Curated annotation (Swiss-Prot):
Function: F-actin-capping proteins bind in a Ca(2+)-independent manner to the fast growing ends of actin filaments (barbed end) thereby blocking the exchange of subunits at these ends. Unlike other capping proteins (such as gelsolin and severin), these proteins do not sever actin filaments. May play a role in the formation of epithelial cell junctions. Forms, with CAPZB, the barbed end of the fast growing ends of actin filaments in the dynactin complex and stabilizes dynactin structure.
Lineage of the species this protein comes from: Eukaryota, Metazoa, Chordata, Craniata, Vertebrata
GO CC term, one of those recorded: WASH complex
Main location: cytoplasm
PROSITE patterns xrefs: F_ACTIN_CAPPING_A_1, F_ACTIN_CAPPING_A_2
Name of the featured protein: F-actin-capping protein subunit alpha-1
Species assigned in the record: Pongo abelii (Sumatran orangutan)
Chain coiled-coil ranges: none
Annotated SUPFAM superfamilies: Subunits of heterodimeric actin filament capping protein Capz
GO biological process: actin cytoskeleton organization; barbed-end actin filament capping; cell junction assembly
């Protein structure tokens, strides 16, 4: 280990550690962080050098956070990043400090949001909240309104997760949707991501994403929001159905082709009988 430490610079160690952290499966950040911490054996170097990786992970994963005094959780995303570890909660019109390691919010302050797009953002937010409530048992969403390159833009982010460490699996759904307010029609651009990790007696990960494009009729705020949500619903239903069908096909064909159902002898092994033989033999020898 000493030779390894001598050969690898602190900069390279931090780069490797950051790589592990940013690729941590959903719901397993703490486990990966603790393992990396043991390997690096230098807390100051890890906290200072890999702090950017903590932030990247939380923004990429759309980590939801509860702010004390406010009912709804908000997502940590690049679209709400105000710098200096402060993030925007457009629904509650506040900014807050976020600890990327502890995943805790603090110091909420009033913040100007929407950039003159208040009615557009609120219409889309209201419609999206209703959709998420209907389709996700543990879902959260945040809607931003921004002017990007002179274009008035609505950005909608959705996150839903199920963490079941006692059953050896964790999973997260993320989707991001954008459109510019350019009557009479606008292009909707979306990306959908699924990441699931199953690790009982093995290590299997599903990492999937799909890019979506569609056209949207831009009229008044309420009607446009309704059409926007309809596009989201159709695309996400189609994606989920395709994933389910693909895995059923793999289960019926691909996975079965990977191994024999019976060994070469064409006889199933009775493991319980073998175990009883072994125990009996050991008792005789005793």
């Amino acid at each position: 280990m000493a030779d390894f430490d001598d050969r690898v610079s602190d900069e390279e160690k931090v780069r490797i550690a950051a790589k592990f952290i940013t690729h941590a499966p959903p719901g397993e950040f703490n486990e990966v962080f603790n393992d990396v911490r043991l390997l690096l054996n230098n807390d100051n170097l890890l906290r200072e050098g890999a702090a950017h990786a903590f932030a990247l992970y939380n923004m990429d994963q759309f980590t939801p956070v509860k702010i004390e005094g406010y009912e709804d959780q908000v997502l940590i995303t690049e679209h709400g990043d105000l710098g200096n570890s402060r993030f925007l909660d457009p629904r509650n019109k506040i900014s807050f400090k976020f600890d990327h390691l502890r995943k805790e919010a603090s110091d909420p302050q009033p913040e100007e949001v929407d950039g003159g797009l208040k009615s557009w953002r609120e219409s889309c937010d209201s419609a999206l909240r209703a959709y998420v409530k209907d389709h996700y048992s543990n879902g959260f969403c945040t809607v931003y309104a921004k002017t990007i390159d002179g274009q008035q833009t609505i950005i909608a982010c959705i996150e839903s997760h199920q963490f079941q460490p006692k059953n050896f699996w964790n999973g997260r759904w993320r989707s991001e949707w954008k459109f510019t307010i350019t009557p009479p029609t606008a292009q909707v651009v979306g990306v959908l991501k699924i990441q699931v990790h199953y690790y009982e007696d093995g290590n299997v990960q599903l990492v999937s994403h799909k890019d979506v494009q569609d056209s949207l009729t831009v009229s008044n705020e309420a009607q446009t929001a309704k059409e926007f949500i309809k596009i989201i619903e159709n695309a996400e239903n189609e994606y989920q159905t395709a994933i389910s069908e693909n895995y059923q096909t793999m289960s019926d064909t691909t996975f079965k082709a990977l191994r024999r159902q019976l060994p070469v002898t064409r006889t199933k092994i009775d493991w319980n009988k073998i175990l009883s033989y072994k125990i009996g033999k050991e008792m005789q020898n005793a």
